[in-house]
Amino acid sequence: MCFLCDLKTSGQPAPADPDAASATTGPPRWSGRRGFLLAAGAAAATAAAGPALAQVDVGNASAMRQLVPAETLEASATQQYSRMLAEAKSKGALAPDSHPQLQRLRAIGNRLIPLTPQWNDRAREWRWEVNLIGSKQINAFCMPGGKIAFYTGILDQLKLSDDEAAMIMGHEMAHALREHARSRLAKTQATSMGLSLGAQLLGLGQLGNIAADMGTQLLTLKFSRTDETEADLVGLELAARAGYNPQASVSLWEKMGKASGGAGGPGFLSTHPSGPNRIRELQANVPRVQGLYERAKRG
């Protein structure tokens, strides 16, 4: 899981999971039914027209991901996501549909989701969800299959604008679209089992049975620096195509740097590009998507 910023609030360690976060920080008790579902088929039908050619270059997705069946991993992720929401709800930490911040996030999602099939055709079939969990932890994620969650800490502590929130959502969605979790789990399991990509592709079995048990790993999965850079750039373009100012990607990570004391701590640095390098990469790519943003704003 891309714990977007493996950050810790000042004087208070970030809990290892959202359930622990909810219990530790004692958020206001919320009631209300669990969040909404967006039918990806309908969303794709209303997708805004745009250039099919990506403006940022991230190369091809890893072939290793083929070792894990996408359908199996997505089903496992859906089960884990449902359990997580149920736990949050039992602790009064799941935002109801009427919560203003949740409505804001879903409005952003409604603009981003129709554009996602340009990066992964499977996204047309995903049943997207966006939910909000009460926790001081600075975090957000998107599981395989389009299951998104934000923690209130990332909204409240960073004082995010809509453009900045869209950059975070785009980044997390990009991890799912580029199937980073699928690739990382496949590499890990294949290595531990002594399997080669060639042997798998020649029909010597898949990791399907293992994938069915991978849901619990998704909440602690750490992506590589390459994965993080890909997610930054794909998320940048996705948000720009939806009409969100790409300059917000820079201001977002400047805020992240300040929130983490300028470094982010060992856990952050182990899986993310350093702050200055990340910002420079984004700054170099903003001009490539600026035209997409301006076109989207013109309607």
Summary of predicted features, one role per range:
Residues 2-299:
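A Zn2+-metalloprotease active-site environment signal
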